[in-house]
Amino acid sequence: MAGSSIGECFRVSTFGESHGPAIGCIVDGCPPGMTLSAADIQTELDRRRPGRSRHTTQRQEADQVEILSGVFEGLTTGTPIGLLIRNTDQRSQDYSKIKDLFRPGHADYTYLQKYGLRDYRGGGRSSARETAMRVAAGAIARKFLRERLGVNIQAWMAQMGPIHAEDFDAAEISHNDFFCPDAGAAIRMADFLDGLRKEGDSIGARVDARVSGMPVGLGEPVFDRLEADIAKAMMSINAVKAIAVGDGFAVVEQRGSYHGDAMAATGFQSNHAGGVLGGISSGQDLTLSVAIKPTSSIRIPRQSIDVHGRPAEVITTGRHDPCVGIRAVPIVEAMLALVIMDHWMRHRAQNADVQAPLPPIPA
């Protein structure tokens, strides 16, 4: 299977399936000399971990990460970092009744058509279980970006179905089960999901993100524009169906006199572009939104076919998230960290000695 790696200079390759013995990744290109421990990575994994609240899948995985290589006496060595998480709470029998059925909205049909076979246990490689390793790798990139460059990455639940976060309190994001900056909205989300779970249905979500402390100059035009690589990274996350950078789709109704971010010696006057101009970071905050579809695994009967093309009714049992947007928040942060880290290293490799005639203006 091709397509299991991301990045050029800071490259991450993941492996493993939902119900296999383990999942893992190789992080290649991490600079040497950075302090790193399993605890540094575990902090991020615990935010994504299944079973952390009643509103997510009740699969109980500890997600304890093991560092296999690339770290010696607490410091990164510059060699490939091997990470492993052992799967401990698989229930493959939950899928035995649907092993010959195509679940609507899932990758069952396309995997079978592409590979001629498929791992029906929890979706195999197509499962969001794989994203745990992205979060693990992203924790390494995020630590470097924060400590070396002062880059801060923050994502949050901005909308769940009809419920919007109307207030923004950054401190509140870590104080509720939804990573929501609006305490009142988080309460409404909890009530909404309780009812939805009883119905056996699911709901979509929108995750917003902001990266502050961005260096100027990251991005490789024309095909590796910063927002292009971010879009690819976001669209690689299970269930993501759309991404908007800056003002996103609102630009359709904007005029150029409004949208163009005016500049002065004192700094930018607005940030409709979302921190990227011509595919290169401007030094302003990088802002984006990601739309996430409803979970396809629901207990409501749906029409489908089996592997022989015969009509069938599908009811998905097992343990599933009624809203995958909740656990997508740390995944979005991780993917942002991986892309920004990779582009910083690429920029440094070519342009480390560049002296622009004008110092960066304030963001």
Swiss-Prot record:
Required cofactor(s): FMNH2
Molecular function per GO: chorismate synthase activity; FMN binding
Key word Flavoprotein present: yes
Disulphide bond pairs: none
One term under GO cellular component: cytosol
Top-level taxon: Bacteria
Name of the molecule in the record: Chorismate synthase
Binding site for NADP(+): R48, R54
PROSITE patterns reported in the protein's UniProt record: CHORISMATE_SYNTHASE_1 (PS00787), CHORISMATE_SYNTHASE_2 (PS00788), CHORISMATE_SYNTHASE_3 (PS00789)
Keywords: Amino-acid biosynthesis, Aromatic amino acid biosynthesis, FAD, Flavoprotein, FMN, Lyase, NADP
Role noted for this protein: This reaction introduces a second double bond into the aromatic ring system.
CDD domains, sorted: Chorismate_synthase
Subunit structure: Homotetramer.
Single GO BP term: chorismate biosynthetic process
Higher taxonomy: Bacteria, Pseudomonadati, Pseudomonadota, Acidithiobacillia, Acidithiobacillales
Biological pathway: Metabolic intermediate biosynthesis; chorismate biosynthesis; chorismate from D-erythrose 4-phosphate and phosphoenolpyruvate: step 7/7
Manner of cofactor binding, per the entry note: Reduced FMN (FMNH(2)).
EC nos: 4.2.3.5
Coiled-coil intervals: none
Family membership noted in the UniProt record: Belongs to the chorismate synthase family.
Pfam families xrefs: Chorismate_synt
